[in-house]
Curated annotation (Swiss-Prot):
Protein name: MEMO1 family protein LS215_2219
Highest taxon of the lineage: Archaea
Family in the record: Belongs to the MEMO1 family.
PANTHER family linked: PROTEIN MEMO1
Length: 284
C-alpha cells in the first residue's frame, strides 16, 4: 500500500532538485539556523527524543522547522520517526494510523514500521488503522522531505493523525508510546509533534497568543496548554500532538528548549494576518 503525496507542488516543490534547494534555503534563511547540519554516523544514545515542528508551506514555515531538524540530524539517523499530526480534513477516525506499506514524496519512498505501529495499536486501544484520514492530510507529509534530504530511505515512520485532541487521548497515546519505547531499547525512536501556532490574527496578536502557549510548553504543562487553547481563543491546530510530547518529555525526564518562534509575517511578508510557527526540542 503506497500513500502518494497530496501537497507536492503546493506546500513544497514537486521537482526533486528544486525541493532539495528549498530545504537548503530553509536552513540558510536568516530566520532559520543559517547552516546545514553535519550528520554523524556514530551510534550513540540520543538526547533529544521529542520535537515540535510546524507544517505550513515551506516558504512560510520551512526556516522555523529547520531549527528542529538541525538538532535531530546532528544526533544521527533515527531508526523510527513517529509523526503525530492534527487532522485538518475531518476524514476518518478520531485517531488514525496509516496501516502498512510506504509513503512517497518527490525524494523517494519511506516505509512504515509495521512492527512498532502494531505495538502502539495494542498498547493504546485508541488508534485505528485507517488510511482515509491521511489521504489529503498535509501535517505529516510535509515533514518527510526534510528527513529524506538527510537520511534517504534509511529510516521508517509511524504516521498518526489525531482528530479528537483531548487530554485523555493525549494521555493514552503518550502512555502507549512510552511503553513501546521502553520495550524497544535498541531502536532509536524519535517523536515529532507537527503543529502550527495561532492562525490569521495580526502579527502582534498572534505573538501575544503564542507566548501564552509557549510558556505552558516550556513548563511541560500539557493541561495548562489545553486550557490556553480552549479558553483563550488560541487557534493552535496541533495541540494534541504537542500535549503527547509534553507528557513524554516529563516521563523521560527531559526539559523543553524553544529553538525558534516566528510568524509567516517574519518569513514571507504581510503582517496583517499571519500564522505562528514554533520549533522546540525536548532534551537534557
Amino acid at each position: 500500500m503506497k500513500r502518494l503525496p497530496a501537497v507536492a507542488g503546493s506546500f513544497y516543490e514537486s521537482d526533486p532538485k528544486k525541493l532539495k534547494m528549498q530545504i537548503e534555503w530553509s536552513f540558510r534563511h536568516n530566520i532559520g539556523p543559517r547552516d546545514i547540519p553535519k550528520q554523524t554516523y556514530e551510534k550513540k544514545k540520543r538526547d533529544n527524543l521529542f520535537f515540535v515542528v510546524p507544517h505550513a508551506g515551506y516558504i512560510y514555515s520551512g526556516p522555523v522547522a529547520a531549527h528542529s531538524y538541525y538538532y535531530l540530524v546532528s544526533e544521527g539517523r533515527p531508526d523510527v520517526v513517529i509523526i503525530l499530526g492534527p487532522n485538518h480534513t475531518g476524514l476518518g477516525s478520531y485517531v488514525s494510523a496509516w496501516p502498512k506499506g510506504e509513503w512517497e514524496t518527490p525524494l523517494g519512498s519511506v516505509k512504515i514500521d509495521e512492527e512498532i505501529l502494531m505495538q502502539l495499536v495494542k498498547e493504546s486501544e485508541v488508534i485505528d488503522l485507517d488510511e482515509k484520514s491521511h489521504l489529503y492530510e498535509h501535517s505529516i507529509e510535509v515533514q518527510l522531505p526534510f528527513l529524506q534530504y538527510f537520511f534517504d530511505d534509511d529510516f521508517k515512520i509511524v504516521p498518526i493523525v489525531i482528530m479528537m485532541q483531548t487530554l485523555e487521548i493525549a494521555e493514552f497515546l503518550a502512555d502507549a508510546i512510552y511503553n513501546v519505547m521502553q520495550k524497544n531499547p535498541d531502536k532509536d525512536i524519535v517523536v515529532l509533534a507537527s503543529s502550527d501556532m495561532n492562525h490569521y490574527d495580526p502579527h502582534e496578536i498572534t505573538v501575544k497568543k503564542d507566548v501564552e502557549a509557549i510558556e505552558k510548553i516550556q513548563q511541560l504543562d500539557y493541561k495548562g496548554l489545553y486550557e490556553v487553547v480552549e479558553g483563550k481563543d488560541v487557534t493552535l491546530c496541533g495541540y494534541g500532538p504537542i500535549m503527547v510530547n509534553l507528557i513524554l518529555a516529563k516521563k523521560f525526564g527531559k526539559k523543553a528548549y524553544i529553538l525558534k518562534h516566528a510568524t509567516s509575517g517574519d518569513t514571507s511578508g504581510p503582517k496583517d494576518s499571519v500564522v505562528g510557527y514554533l520549533a522546540a526540542r525536548f532534551g537534557s
